[in-house]
């Protein structure tokens, strides 16, 4: 996958040799240390789904480069989440890449990214890399850097 995938807590905890609860605590501590960003579903009514993060990304895209892993999809999504989270609440949506303030839905991609995944969803936008100017609901990804 080109972008971060949903967290499989059971598989990850088994790989690390810890329980799921211990994994959640470790992830929470890494988030508090600002190394990771945990994204949760915000529309779920099931309290268990709120207990574990649905997606785990690095807090800052620079960490990806420092580790020598610079998948452009992950960098784009990490950048948007990092910039948006400065003053807004970011969550993991059922559709799209990022739900902001439980209202605005974003799909992240390159200049050719289409609205196919989020069409017919109100308040949805494409945050596109490699474009200088926005049009309609397509916003240049670099503009989100001004939110920081």
Tell where the protein language model's regions lie, with residue ranges.
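Accessory nucleic acid-recognition modules appended to NTPase machines
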Residues: 1-94
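Generic beta-sheet signal
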Residues: 59, 108, 127-129
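Short, solvent-exposed loop/turn segments at secondary-structure junctions
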Residues: 63-64, 111-112, 131-132
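Active-site-adjacent loop/helix micro-motif of nuclease/hydrolase catalytic cores
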Residues: 71, 111-120, 135-136
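Conserved catalytic cores of phosphodiester-cleaving nucleases, focusing on short active-site segments
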Residues: 84, 96-117
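Nucleic-acid nuclease catalytic cores
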Residues: 101, 123-134
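Short, solvent-exposed amphipathic alpha-helical segments in soluble enzyme
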Residues: 121-123, 141-142
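Domain-level recognition of nuclease-like catalytic cores that cleave nucleotide substrates
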Residues: 132-148
